[in-house]
């Protein structure tokens, strides 16, 4: 392993460790996403507690956390295999952030950003798969699961040199969704449309009050 590859792997992990969901919620004076809603510091949970603008901001930042390190590694001529390891490091940082007590999100947006840096054709297929699944089912988590399952096949078809690291990345995302898989199986997973409806029916004061009550229970 070259010094460039090792340096980019470390850099990617540190970038991933910056939890945009937590920071944006603090800036917007919203409840801590780790203690409210699903407890997951990601864009979907921020959508539940903070609305579309906050969720979109989190989504963009999470995508960039994966995209920027992989792009930089590519321009530093890091070999394809280690380029994939850089992508995995960014996702590991998002999932186990060193700056936030190793309690992070599920890595979907960061994984998407990493793959987008490898090829826009791949990112288009994955985004289309997620969107189609969500539109048909209403489940954001199911969209992530189906996309993670199909991503290695898309990569194998277009850029086979990245198949192995992307397969590892997909396994990581699927592992982080094991609770969602169980809830989907039991029919207990909430649909994304339900989250939006609940958000519009509540005032900001009610949301913050619920967060405080949940913190007391914890």
Curated annotation (Swiss-Prot):
Q: Molecular function terms in GO for this entry?
A: acyl-phosphate glycerol-3-phosphate acyltransferase activity
Pathway participation: Lipid metabolism; phospholipid metabolism
- Gene Ontology biological-process entries: phospholipid biosynthetic process
The places in or outside the cell where this protein is found are:
Cell inner membrane
Q: What do the Gene Ontology cellular component annotations say?
A: plasma membrane
Q: How does the protein's chain sit in the membrane according to the entry?
A: Multi-pass membrane protein
Q: What is its EC number?
A: 2.3.1.275
Instruction: Please name the top-level EC class of this enzyme.
Output: transferase
This enzyme catalyses: an acyl phosphate + sn-glycerol 3-phosphate = a 1-acyl-sn-glycero-3-phosphate + phosphate
- Cross-referenced SMART domains, in alphabetical order? G3P_acyltransf (SM01207)
Give UniProt keywords alphabetically.
Answer: Cell inner membrane, Cell membrane, Lipid biosynthesis, Lipid metabolism, Membrane, Phospholipid biosynthesis, Phospholipid metabolism, Transferase, Transmembrane, Transmembrane helix
Chain ranges passing through the membrane? 5-25, 53-73, 80-100, 115-135, 138-158
Task: Give the family this protein belongs to, as stated in its UniProt record.
Answer: Belongs to the PlsY family.
Q: What is the protein's known function?
A: Catalyzes the transfer of an acyl group from acyl-phosphate (acyl-PO(4)) to glycerol-3-phosphate (G3P) to form lysophosphatidic acid (LPA). This enzyme utilizes acyl-phosphate as fatty acyl donor, but not acyl-CoA or acyl-ACP.
The record describes its quaternary structure and partners as: Probably interacts with PlsX.
Q: What is this protein called?
A: Glycerol-3-phosphate acyltransferase
Q: Which organism is it from?
A: Proteus mirabilis (strain HI4320)
């Amino acid at each position: 392993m070259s010094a460039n590859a090792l340096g980019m792997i470390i850099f990617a992990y540190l970038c991933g460790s910056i939890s945009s969901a937590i920071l944006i919620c603090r800036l917007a004076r919203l409840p801590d996403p780790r203690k409210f809603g699903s407890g997951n510091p990601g864009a979907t949970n921020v959508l539940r507690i903070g609305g579309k603008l906050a969720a979109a901001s989190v989504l963009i930042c999470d995508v960039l956390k994966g995209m920027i390190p992989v792009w930089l590694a590519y321009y530093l001529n890091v070999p394809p295999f280690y380029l994939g390891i850089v992508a995995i490091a960014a996702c590991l940082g998002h999932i186990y952030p060193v700056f936030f007590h190793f309690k992070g999100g599920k890595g979907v947006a960061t994984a998407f950003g990493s793959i987008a840096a490898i090829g826009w054709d791949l990112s288009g297929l994955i985004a289309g798969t997620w969107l189609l699944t969500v539109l048909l089912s209403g489940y954001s988590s199911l969209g992530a699961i189906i996309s993670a399952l199909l991503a290695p096949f898309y990569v194998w078809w277009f850029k086979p040199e990245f198949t192995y690291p992307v397969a590892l990345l997909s396994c990581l995302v699927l592992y982080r969704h094991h609770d969602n898989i169980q809830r989907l199986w039991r029919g207990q997973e909430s649909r994304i449309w339900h989250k939006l409806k609940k958000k519009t029916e509540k005032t900001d004061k009610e949301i913050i009050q619920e967060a405080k009550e949940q913190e007391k229970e914890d």
